Amino acid sequence: MKLAYWMYAGPAHIGTLRVASSFKNVHAIMHAPLGDDYFNVMRSMLERERDFTPVTASIVDRHVLARGSQEKVVETITRKDKEEQPDLILLTPTCTSSILQEDLQNFVNRAATESKSDVILADVNHYRVNELQAADRTLEQIVRFYIEKAKTQNDLATIKTEKPSVNIIGIFTLGFHNHHDCRELKRLLTDLGISINEVIPEGGSIKNLKNLPKAWFNLIPYREVGLMTAKYLEKELNMPFVATTPMGVIDTAICIREIEAILNFTNQSKIDKEPYNFEDYIDQQTRFVSQAAWFSRSIDCQNLTGKKAIVFGDSTHAASMTKILAREMGIRISCAGTYCKHDADWFREQVSGFCDSVLITDDHTKVGDMIARVEPAAIFGTQMERHVGKRLDIPCGVISAPVHIQNFPLGYRPFLGYEGTNQIADLVYNSFTLGMEDHLLEIFGGHDTKQVITKSLSTDSNLTWTIEGLAELNKIPGFVRAKIKRNTEKFARENNISEITIETMYAAKEAVGA
């Protein structure tokens, strides 16, 4: 456990609650002290939904510590069972309440005898896993529970649908543009003649989990959540899955070809059927629907060729974005990174050959220092990299959770599929400062009234600029001023100069060979 004012992935119970609150008619009970129960506020603030967050906190206070938790937890479960009448009640501790080492499974067993709802305990080690790993595990646990329940009741729907169908697994609340991606995936799959069997957990009913085996295959758009469920269904029910994220023109085509291979394999028993071939669709979409392929050959995109960028985010979005920028737009990726340390090997394999260096860390200060050191033309990252970019005057496009309210847009903004390629192209182009715009504003917009502000990430600087030095700095065009200021301050620190004059600026210029 560590104290931080910013975490890329939250504690495990947040992931469990995200999955539980994504399903319809599932109620989560959080056994936690005050302070751990911020999920309701966070979800209500960020998600553009009208329903209440179905999470109740069973508060651990001094009375509970004195008498034990069993009575209160069981009473909360049975009360919510009567009030809400959910299909499932999911009990989860937090990392704080786990310290008490209580037998919560025993509480669940007792409450289950008094409740009409199913009651389960989230099987997550709160000290070993983060939010995303816990979400993946909880989704798999819920699916496993209902598949096994359907098996014992001989109620499992194992007969495949007549026409190709798919389960989309991993769309859930507070995800990065997940609702928009889901709509785009449905449109893409419908174009291919594939019907949607189930979408879980977002908007899914646990009563329908027994119907998962009816689909021909499972689609996992994000590695972070859904992969464990897909592997379980493959092992138990022999269901194939596609885990290639259809992000960018090239990977979308790869994903469609993988789907084509699965459909032809599943369909091979039907002798009279023509094999599925989606090459014409890929060609049509790439050339005429997606503007990204055309844009990447335009003079606008060629202006970006060779520019330096940094990418950081969850493993799915960071890896995909790195490949799109390098392969499809010719942008040089100085560093690609992810905070998903548990997925480091896969990430390194994906970005190998597309970037100069790889950074695997969940420490935002290391990411900030790396950005300050590299001084890229643009950053593509999370909300935190957006903050860093503002402090360093480097533009940033947000491409991954965690994000704030700006990235829960009301308009349609998918990142997956062919429409997603258009959104990404817009984001990339608009993130780079256009050539001379800053300079032209200064020339034609009157004299520059902007005060020079500190662009270094360290706030303990004791450097001072003389009036003459600042006046000279203000004469420098805005689009290179920040870089020159940083280089001058770096030179001053290295040479123990506390007051920066015009002479210091010229000495720094000579030192860097400019």
UniProtKB/Swiss-Prot annotation:
Catalytic reaction equation(s): chlorophyllide a + oxidized 2[4Fe-4S]-[ferredoxin] + 2 ADP + 2 phosphate = protochlorophyllide a + reduced 2[4Fe-4S]-[ferredoxin] + 2 ATP + 2 H2O
Membrane-spanning ranges: none
Cofactor note text: Binds 1 [4Fe-4S] cluster per heterodimer. The cluster is bound at the heterodimer interface by residues from both subunits.
Name of this chain's protein: Light-independent protochlorophyllide reductase subunit B
Protein family (similarity comment): Belongs to the ChlB/BchB/BchZ family.
Molecular functions (GO terms): 4 iron, 4 sulfur cluster binding; ATP binding; metal ion binding; oxidoreductase activity, acting on iron-sulfur proteins as donors; oxidoreductase activity, acting on the CH-CH group of donors, iron-sulfur protein as acceptor
NCBIfam families per record: DPOR_BchB
Residue numbers annotated as active site: D300
GO BP: light-independent chlorophyll biosynthetic process; photosynthesis, dark reaction
Cofactor(s) needed for function: [4Fe-4S] cluster
Record EC number: 1.3.7.7
Keywords: 4Fe-4S, ATP-binding, Chlorophyll biosynthesis, Chloroplast, Iron, Iron-sulfur, Metal-binding, Nucleotide-binding, Oxidoreductase, Photosynthesis, Plastid
CDD domains in alphabetical order: Pchlide_reductase_B
Native organism taxonomy: Eukaryota, Viridiplantae, Chlorophyta, core chlorophytes, Chlorophyceae
Subcellular location: Plastid, Chloroplast
GO CC annotation: chloroplast
The encoding gene: chlB
Gene3D superfamilies (alphabetical): 1.20.89.20, Nitrogenase molybdenum iron protein domain (3.40.50.1980), Proto-chlorophyllide reductase 57 kD subunit B (1.10.8.550)
Source organism of this protein record: Pleurastrum terricola (Filamentous green alga)
InterPro entries with a match to the protein in the record: ChlB/BchB/BchZ (IPR050152), LI-POR_suB-like_C (IPR013580), Nase/OxRdtase_comp1 (IPR000510), P-CP_red_C (IPR042298), Protochl_reductB (IPR005969), Protochlorophyllide_Rdtase (IPR016209)
